[in-house]
Amino acid sequence: MYFHYKKQKDLSIFGLIFKNQLQDKKSIMKLLVCISQTPDTTTKIKFSDDNTAFDKNGVQFIMNPYDEWYALVRALELKEQQGGSVTILHVGPQANETVIRKGLAIGADDAVRVDAEPQNAMFTAAQIAAYAKSENFDIVFMGKETIDYNGSEVAAMTAEMLDAPFVSYATKLDVSGDTATLERDIEGCLLYTSDAADE
C-alpha cells in the first residue's frame, strides 16, 4: 500500500539508476530519491536484555545522511538546472513520517511511503523497483549506503530488478538532452566517466 505526501506551499556520495533512454528536453524529467531512516550517530544504542535486538526506546532517528546530503541534494540541484520533479520514496511504517516531511521541507515536490517494514535489502529493493517501474522515473537516486548497516546493496539490487544501468559511488552528474554523463571514484582516486544512456 502506498501513502502519498505533498509538499506544503509555505515550506530545496549517491548511487544512480537510469532508464535506458532519458526523456528528451520537451518532457518533464522525473527524479526519484530513495530515503531511509537511521539512528542518529550521537544516540546511545542499548540492546534488549537477551542481546538479540537493539532497544529503540529513547533512540533519536534521522534521515540517512547519505540519502539527504548527496542523493536528495543532487536531485534537487538537477531539477533546478533542468526542470522536472523530485519525488521521495521511503519504505517503512507510519512512525517514520518525520524523515519524509523533512525531505519535503528540504525541497522535494512530493513523497510516497510504502507501508511495509523493511525486512532485508532484497525486500526493500523489490518495493522500490515496483514503485519506480509503475511511475516511469528517469533517474533514481540513492545514498551510497546507510550509516547503520553499511550494506550498499539496495541500489544495485533495484537496478537489476529494473534491468536498468547503474553506477555506484557517483561523485558528479551532468545531464544534456537525453544523455547523462557521470564520474565516480575508483581505486587510486582516479575518476571514471560513463555515458549512462549507452550502457
What are these regions (language model features)?
Residues M29-I88:
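N-terminal beta-strand-loop-alpha-helix module at the start
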Residues V99-F123:
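A glycine-rich helix N-cap at a beta->alpha junction
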Residues N120-A132:
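Glycine/small-residue-rich loop that forms an oxyanion/phosphate-binding "nest" at active or ligand-binding sites
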Residues E135-T146:
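Short beta-strand-loop elements within alpha/beta enzyme cores
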Residues Y149-F166:
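Short Gly/Thr/Asp-enriched flexible loops that form oxyanion-binding sites at enzyme active sites
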Residues L173, T179-L191:
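Anionic-ligand binding region
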Residues Y192-E199:
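Conserved small/polar residues in nucleotide/adenosyl-binding loops
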